Curated annotation (Swiss-Prot):
Protein family per UniProt: Belongs to the small leucine-rich proteoglycan (SLRP) family. SLRP class II subfamily.
Name of the protein: Lumican
PTM info: Contains keratan sulfate.
LRR repeats: 70-91, 94-117, 120-140, 141-162, 165-186, 190-211, 212-232, 235-255, 260-281, 282-301, 310-330
GO cellular component: extracellular space
Gene3D superfamilies associated with the record: Ribonuclease Inhibitor
Modified residues (Pyrrolidone carboxylic acid): 19
Keywords: Disulfide bond, Extracellular matrix, Glycoprotein, Leucine-rich repeat, Proteoglycan, Pyrrolidone carboxylic acid, Repeat, Secreted, Signal, Sulfation
Subcellular location: Secreted, Extracellular space, Extracellular matrix
Main location: secreted
Species this protein is from: Gallus gallus (Chicken)
Matches recorded under Pfam families: LRR_1, LRR_8, LRRNT
Source organism phylogeny: Eukaryota, Metazoa, Chordata, Craniata, Vertebrata
Length: 343
């Protein structure tokens, strides 16, 4: 990974583990900021230390308050908001973050082009609502779209078209099927992070951008992977396919031999053998399958002073393997492995 890509990589990593850590006003049992600024909706908090942020969380609001001009960061989490009128944000053209998690929003009650009119919007989070399809149209400035834990069954063709700055999409925990998203992400050439876990996918979708760094398909119903599916993914580093229905016959020989890959999770499937992976792979999760043999060729094509597997963590617990099944020469191939779990 280059130094130039490290800052955005760290942002993505923090998004994985702290998806809802939006800022300094998270769910305090007291007011950590003191008095609000004079320019603020009376029921909300616009702290003096963060004068362009308005916090309206946990207020049982049914409608969005009037948002004063100059607000850039708007938090409306954990309310009872059901609708957004088209003119709701006409006064806040500088809005950059709009956080609407844990409300009662439905697509039919999000009116017109309410989001696309926000020409500076970068983050739109509508996790834990009642959406049945991806919202849109959206502004081209958007870089972070989170729609997880809804009831989304489709991403309409063109819904994400033109979002050239979009780097993060969360669509996990919805009701998406493969046909309803194939081609939906085409042209998103800045996309680095895509989470489609906990849906109803039976196949891998087509048209994913090759810019992806992190790709999550865990907890679906995927049984096979097309040959050369990941060909062209030159920067893919994290791939999760755990809790699916993968078998040996559904995995072409070298489909996971991706030189950029750092972490691969194939745990909780129905594999009997270990797929071939790149010698650059560092973390490999295969626990709870039906694996009964340990071919070194899955990890090392050739073993020598400078040619060996870079795997540091290998999980094989919950399979049909014991220490006695591991070949002695394994330690030449997996010489940097710090942890090999079998039990």
């Amino acid at each position: 990974m280059t130094l130039n890509s490290l800052p955005i990589f760290l942002v993505l990593i923090s998004g994985i583990f702290c998806q809802y850590d939006y800022g300094p006003a998270d769910d305090y049992g007291y007011d950590p900021f003191g008095p609000s600024t004079a320019v603020c909706a009376p029921e909300c908090n616009c702290p003096l230390s963060y004068p362009t942020a308005m916090y309206c969380d946990n207020l049982k609001l049914k409608t969005i308050p009037i948002v004063p001009s100059g607000i850039k960061y708007l938090y409306l989490r954990n309310n009872m908001i059901e609708a957004i009128e088209e003119n709701t944000f006409d006064n806040v053209t500088d809005l950059q973050w709009l956080i609407l998690d844990h409300n009662h929003l439905e697509n039919s009650k999000i009116k017109g082009r309410v989001f696309s009119k926000l020409k500076n919007l970068k983050k739109l989070h509508i996790n834990y609502n009642n959406l049945t399809e991806a919202v849109g149209p959206l502004p081209k400035t958007l870089d972070d779209l989170q729609l997880s834990h809804n009831k989304i069954t489709k991403v309409n063709p063109g819904a994400l078209e033109g979002l050239v700055n979009l780097t993060v999409i969360h669509l996990q925990n919805n009701q998406l099927k493969t046909d309803s998203i194939s081609g939906a992400f085409k042209g998103l050439n800045s996309l680095l992070y895509l989470d489609l876990s906990f849906n109803q996918l039976t196949k891998l979708p087509t048209g994913l951008p090759h810019s992806l760094l992190m790709l999550y398909f865990d907890n679906n119903q995927i049984s096979n992977i097309p040959d050369e599916y990941f060909q062209g993914f030159k920067t893919l580093q994290y791939l999760r396919l755990s809790h699916n229905k993968l078998t040996d016959s559904g995995i072409p020989g070298n489909v996971f031999n991706i030189t950029s890959l750092v972490e691969l999770d194939l745990s909780f499937n129905q594999l009997k053998s270990i797929p071939t992976v790149s010698e650059n792979l560092e973390n490999f999760y295969l626990q709870v399958n039906k694996i009964n043999k340990f071919p070194l060729s899955s990890f090392c094509k050739v073993v020598g002073p400078l040619t060996y597997s870079k795997i540091t963590h290998l999980r094989l617990d919950g399979n049909n393997l014991t220490r006695a099944d591991l070949p002695q020469e394994m330690y030449n191939c997996l010489r940097v492995a710090a942890d090999i779990s079998l039990e």
